[in-house]
Amino acid sequence: MNTYASEKVVLHIEGDEWCPYMCDENAIKQKGLFRDITESIFNSQNYEVKFEFMPWARTLKRGEKGEIDAILAAFKEGREKFIFHKIELIQSLQSFVVLKETNWKFKNFNSLKDIHLGLILGYIYGGNIDQIKNNAKKISEIGGENGLEKNLMKLKNKEIDAVLDENHVLQYYIKKLDLSTSMKFTGNIGKRAGLYIGFPKVLPNSQKLADTVDKGLTKMKKSGEYQKILKKYGLTVKN
């Protein structure tokens, strides 16, 4: 965290491309739901948000060390080195996608024993990552940029049997890659879980920033701004 000469505080935030939540505005002219919310909250409190796309595993490591001011966006589970606000950005659902000709359907963790599953390095999938790894027949974790797009193409090419990711994000990239006619959703894992901005515990201002998010979200929901941003991205999620 640093300041301009005008004393505006600069927040350095990182995350991976995860549209419609975090989008590349140079490609689609929109920043994404979470980036819009984050900027609205902090810009109104004399902060300047500097956001950069990074592979998620790298973002986590940099966040844990306090090399950046925040990570966007994260589940709380398994993230003990971060401080989180109390009100979630959104409730998230993790879903499986397979090729349309595939008969497999997720029923419980035991059903994973039949598939080769594509995941993204560093993701915890709503806190279910240990049970997933303990039950799946085989797992391929992909790192680097555009991980979900790479996994969906691996599924298309039958290199893996299924892909697991956030429901709205899967919908976005399946449409983007024109894969709607060849893929289908086949079950959700666990319950809906909140997504949050994570602030490193090693940084002294993290609790203050988390409190700022809670106050900002409360204000945005009361004024209708939050709902307006949801609608902008075609989301009508209950929160």
Which residue stretches match the model-derived regions?
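A bilobed periplasmic-binding-protein/Venus flytrap-type ligand-binding module shared by bacterial periplasmic
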Residues: 95-105, 193-208
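A ligand-binding cleft/hinge motif common to bilobed small-molecule-binding domains
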Residues: 61-64, 74-82, 161-191
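Flexible hinge/capping segments at coil-to-helix
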Residues: 99-117, 132
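Extended ligand-binding regions for polar small-molecule ligands
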Residues: 35-44, 110-116, 123, 199-232
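Short loop->beta-strand "edge-of-pocket" segments that line small-molecule binding or catalytic clefts
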Residues: 9-23, 109-125, 218
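Short Pro/Gly-enriched coil loops immediately N-terminal to beta-strands
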Residues: 15, 84-97, 111-113, 186-194
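Ligand-binding cleft/hinge of the Venus flytrap
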Residues: 38-47, 87-89, 111-113, 122-145, ...
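Extracytoplasmic small-molecule ligand-binding "clamshell" domains
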Residues: 6-82, 144, 223, 232, ...
